[in-house]
Regions:
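Conserved short S/T/G-enriched processing/targeting/catalytic segments and their helical context
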Residues: 4-108, 146-164, 171, 218-240
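Short, structured patches in soluble enzyme cores that scaffold and shape functional sites
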Residues: 48-50, 114-118, 127-130, 148, ...
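Internal active-site segments that recognize and position negatively charged phosphoryl groups
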Residues: 94-126, 132-134
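Short beta-strand scaffold segments in enzyme catalytic cores
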Residues: 2-8, 13-15, 110-117, 124-126, ...
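Hydrophobic residues embedded in beta-strands of well-ordered beta-sheets
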Residues: 13-14, 44, 122-125, 134, ...
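Gly/Ser/Thr-rich active-site loops/lids in small-molecule metabolic enzymes
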Residues: 125-154, 211-222
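Intrinsically disordered, low-complexity segments enriched in small residues
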Residues: 5, 167, 182-241
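Surface-exposed interaction patches
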Residues: 175-181
Length: 241
């Protein structure tokens, strides 16, 4: 399994994804689930959850189309992010369901979060489903999560709004990821994180973090300590007295 996050704020975008895949307790491997592309007038960040074979095939097709000048469509030629979402959706179903969308689409398909910016256009964030369709997040909850979402979602619900700073969004993403790592053995480090600041030509921060790395540990360790400190200040119930 995996856990991936995409956050959109007024200032930019934050993406995070784990790197663990497993097919049982005795078969655990590490694969990056993030693809980044910032060339020319566009920056695109993609994270994925689901069937590893399908995800890797989609990433390979994206890279092949970028390098093929005769390709009818690629990340280079899409006019906007809705077209990028549609393009990735078609690649998804092509590799998971070559005979057409059916029940295999859910079993063999993958889910993607894509986001970024094309010069002169707004920041964008989309989720692409195994069946090839796609959605944007709600304005009031400007984030998307895929994979093992139940452990890391509460902190996102409490913190993430359109007005949150991109720094706070990044810290929130790390805490969300750490909460999931602590509760689900199918999600594991290293953690890929990408930060894109609005209207910039390149990704601002892109790093693969282990839990011992300072950028990760100084946030997550302090969060754990502060939670315990606050917990100790709760008033006693009357029946405890």
């Amino acid at each position: 399994m995996t856990y991936c996050i995409g956050i959109k704020t007024n200032d930019g975008l934050v993406f995070a994804s784990d790197s663990r895949t497993n097919a049982g307790l005795d078969n655990v491997n590490i694969y990056s689930k993030m693809l980044t592309y910032d060339v020319g007038d566009r920056t695109v960040i993609i994270v994925t959850s689901g069937n590893l074979g399908t995800s890797q095939a989609v990433f390979k097709s994206i890279e092949k189309d970028i390098n093929d000048k005769k390709a009818s469509i690629s990340l280079n030629t899409c006019k906007d992010f809705e077209q990028i979402a549609s393009y990735i959706g078609k690649l998804n179903t092509k590799h998971s369901s070559p005979d057409g969308i059916n029940t295999d689409s859910l079993v063999l398909g993958s889910t993607f979060i894509i986001g970024g910016q094309i010069r002169g256009q707004d920041l964008e964030l989309y989720m692409v489903y195994p069946q090839g369709n796609y959605i944007r997040p709600a304005d009031s909850k400007p984030y998307l999560v895929i994979g093992e979402v139940k452990y890391g979602k509460p902190i996102l619900d409490r913190v993430i709004t359109p007005n949150v700073s991109i720094g706070d969004a990044s810290r929130c993403a790390l805490i969300s990821m750490d909460s999931t790592l602590k509760s689900d053995l199918t999600v594991g480090p290293p953690i890929d994180i990408a930060v894109y600041k609005k209207d910039q030509p390149k990704i601002s921060y892109l790093k693969c973090l282990n839990t011992s790395d300072e950028d990760y540990s100084k946030v997550c360790n302090q969060w754990s300590e502060k939670v315990l400190q606050v917990f100790d200040t709760f008033p006693k119930f009357d029946w405890e007295k």
